[in-house]
Amino acid sequence: MVIVKSWQKIFALLVVLLLCIGCSKVPSTSYNPWAVVSLPTEAKLLDIAFTENPQHGFLVGSNATLLETNDGGNNWQPLNLALDDDRYRFDSVSFAGKEGWIAGEPSLLLHTTDEGRSWSRIPLSEKLPGNPIAIQALGTDIAEMATDVGAIYKTTDGGKNWKAQVEAAVGVVRNLERSEDGKYVAVSAKGSFYSTWEPGQNAWVPHNRNSSRRVENMGFSQDGLWLLARGGQVQFSDPTKPDEWLDAQTPELATSWGLLDMAYRTPNEVWIGGGSGNLLVSTDGGKTWEKDRDVEEVAANFYKVVFLKPDQGFVIGDRGVLLKYQPEAAKTATTEPAA
């Protein structure tokens, strides 16, 4: 009986060892280009944007959190706006030149024309379908706003009037992404399907997910769509057949954390943020992956990855965590001679 129990313990240890080996199959990056930025908040941060001045930017988040930087994102100071409630959730921020917008819940839209020195509230109709969760500044007095049920509106007069871009909403969404040329992809609240829309269409086009795994997030790649599914799976649409998908990949097997967001730094270099401080990178457009293990000890889920320019990027995590891309670290690592 004692012998049997001993063998059971040995077998259990072997299983754990094999699982650990499986977890570590992803090679480590040769360098870490990310630095942890200290922030004066533990609020949930949701979006980041910079003005025409690359040193001047804003972070937004829950509990009406608004942070400002004047040194490119190394240091941030909190700003307090004169709102009727401090429980507003600032979901999205966007700038075009000196003009900026903040969209939030419930039913909040803020506008600035002086690079964020002052903000005014734009009245929204009580009949607006859903709450604003995404805003894109497109030029002087021009912006596009989307709500959490997929209603899309555009203004060309600084927010005085808004024109609906779709005839009907798509339903409650968990994620919504806009491409540079004005296309949208939205993931349903439960991740059971996704919808697409592009300028000129009257309505959203629904699509069934292509596997049994629920969709976590989606966005636009260089020549199509990318998809992150539950269980740490990543997939790209077929560049030659837009309605079809390439084979799914699972960069790191036997893990309990999920993949949450993806962003391209260059046409070939793409970063994925995940739960529990996990950060993956591919330098060949998503064919192979490496893991940045230097940030594993950061106690946060990395749920938003943003590259405003190839040398200006950020990873947003929960509990007030922010990583800043260090282009000099990357350049140094790629130019160092081999030992």
Curated annotation (Swiss-Prot):
The keyword Lipoprotein applies. Its main location: membrane. Keywords: Lipoprotein, Membrane, Palmitate, Photosynthesis, Photosystem II, Signal, Thylakoid. Residues 1-22 form the signal peptide. It is found in: Cellular thylakoid membrane. A lipid is attached at residue 23 (S-diacylglycerol cysteine). GO terms for cellular component: photosystem II; plasma membrane-derived thylakoid membrane; thylakoid lumen. InterPro entries: PSII_CF48-like_dom, WD40/YVTN_repeat-like_dom_sf, Ycf48/Hcf136. The keyword Lipoprotein applies. It comes from the Bacteria. Pfam families: PSII_BNR. A lipid is attached at residue 23 (N-palmitoyl cysteine). Part of early PSII assembly complexes which includes D1 (psbA) and PsbI; not found in mature PSII. Binds to the lumenal side of PSII complexes. Interacts with YidC. Belongs to the Ycf48 family. NCBIfam families: PRK13684.1. A factor required for optimal assembly of photosystem II (PSII), acting in the early stages of PSII assembly. Also plays a role in replacement of photodamaged D1 (psbA). Assists YidC in synthesis of chlorophyll-binding proteins. This is Photosystem II assembly lipoprotein Ycf48. It comes from Trichormus variabilis (strain ATCC 29413 / PCC 7937). The gene is ycf48.
